[in-house]
């Protein structure tokens, strides 16, 4: 179901060799902040030198979710491959993440699920990475070393707890202690875009028992030594 042969093909296409691609995987994991991860192959089948943890996998999943094509693929419930010159009949594919699509039963379909990936080996047992979104807040849930159907049940319970007890605040819409610093226009060619601004997409997650005003803020300045701020 995981098309391991495709993982090999992609690895050779991108990295030139399997070994080079695995090195790229480990470098990317390090770049993302993973501290308990080491890859030994591109497909994830068991290897003593191939390991990760829930937190590191969440870091990787968060980075992957920034890619629009990835979001489309993991969020697709069903897909039909039309006939090709290699296969005369169409091929119907179903997503095996039962929180997204009722592959075998509809008991585990989760409201707000936007995709994810299942996994299983004899050594790792069932694993699952799932994305879910409600009221503008997207969560990533990672469960490992479970026995089916607990990968679905544990993920649902974790999602329910977070959605029931936490909420996302848009900082720019709620911040009252700071505002944008506008540039003064000099001449007709200059713009009035702010040179100091609050990211309009930045958010903070707080307990539902808290208000945005309960949070404290701190300005951390970039190191601008020798930077030119005006001429």
Model regions: which residues?
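Domain-terminus/edge residues, biased toward the C-terminal soluble/receptor-binding domains
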Residues: 34, 49-51, 55-56, 61-231
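Active-site-adjacent helix/loop patches that line small-molecule binding or acyl-intermediate pockets
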Residues: 1-80
